[in-house]
């Protein structure tokens, strides 16, 4: 395949849904689109894949216990199907990641254990499991177990002895009063001021992505989000001077991401 076939951002074959100032959004199935990205062209990947809660799961909405139905994209019929889904997208993501690049994957207990196993099965070495401790989690209305107040973010690189991933150790110390940054990050859920462009069920706060991007990339690095949703990764990447590709199969979410990219990020450390 000739290099000039990757004419969008120098790394992408498919015409984008949105392209402006080093930020690209693509309306596509991630499995199909990942095959059209230049191999070993991404410096970092952040993914917030489906949690698969829409199969009888319960949630808190306005103080009421309600069933979870985020859409067909969040439904799965069995554990085997879920794990196969995770192995497939991680396998494709590995192909587009540079030899020294890293991947971050966020999730809850409903999916993160499958993700962790899939990462190792597909040739990754897990560097950290970050615990995001939420200061204002939704209450546990059933009173049958502990309140879910954390999510896990896995950070990994290719399991190759020659791999030399980037970590901005000094900057992370600076953000932590001169002390080593620990793997427990405490902060609030996404602020209302970041949700102005529309509703998404799992929108991540900008401060989480800012820390991730600053810790593991440099200016002008390429960042990929294969489940871009409302576009938080792209918004923060753009503000920090990184190049970005975001993929999503849901056009309604891409509309939100487009609005946010056109306006810019609202948060800064």
Swiss-Prot record:
Give the misc comment: The LlaDCHI restriction system has two different methylases. Genes encoded on plasmid pSQR700 confer strong resistance to the three most common lactococcal phage species (936, c2, and P335). Its presence is probably one reason for the strong bacteriophage resistance shown by strain DCH-4 over the years.
What is the primary gene name for this protein? Answer: llaDCHIB
Keywords attached to this entry: DNA-binding, Methyltransferase, Plasmid, Restriction system, S-adenosyl-L-methionine, Transferase
Q: What class of enzyme is it?
A: transferase
Q: Which InterPro entries match?
A: DNA_methylase_N4/N6 (IPR002941), DNA_methylase_N6_adenine_CS (IPR002052), RM_Methyltransferase (IPR001091), SAM-dependent_MTases_sf (IPR029063)
Q: Could you identify this protein by its name?
A: Type II methyltransferase M2.LlaDCHI
Identify the EC number(s). Answer: 2.1.1.72
Is Transferase among this UniProt entry's keywords? yes
Q: Which GO terms describe its biological process?
A: DNA restriction-modification system; methylation
Q: Please give the GO cellular component terms listed in this UniProt entry.
A: cytoplasm
Q: Name one GO molecular function term.
A: site-specific DNA-methyltransferase (adenine-specific) activity
Q: Write down the superkingdom of origin.
A: Bacteria
